[in-house]
Amino acid sequence: MPQAAAPAAAFSTCDFCDLHTQEQGGPFRVLPPGLQSFGGRTAFFGQVSTVQCFEDNSLVKAALDTPGAGRVLVVDGAGSLRRALVGGNVAAAAARNGWAGVVVHGCVRDAAELAAAGVGIRALGLVPMPTVKRGEGQRD
């Protein structure tokens, strides 16, 4: 494992994966290809927190309104392509509260605002439709 003081550019994702080739089924995981980058940070990492929801971002917003302390929020949006679970306001809150990034198995919106936010954002794609606020879902 690299020294904590090493600059990020000196240690690539591939290097990190090389160090963990013997781990099978442990805590080390890599996301499959298919997620697009929308945030202001292209590379990010951190302890994971989770939200599971379907076309309702109430719990996503609630999570990102708390101190992130460098964590990454992974949102299981069931792969819905009909409603955006993260937009510009939510991304700005994530950056303001110290989250490293958000990974969405679903869609996001407000591409220009996401790109301007100081947080990493990965998602399946863009869709302009907002969510319906029902307060449903699960959060770790």
Each model region followed by its residue ranges:
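Feature captures the catalytic cores and cofactor-binding loops of soluble hydro-lyases/lyases
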Residues: 2-140
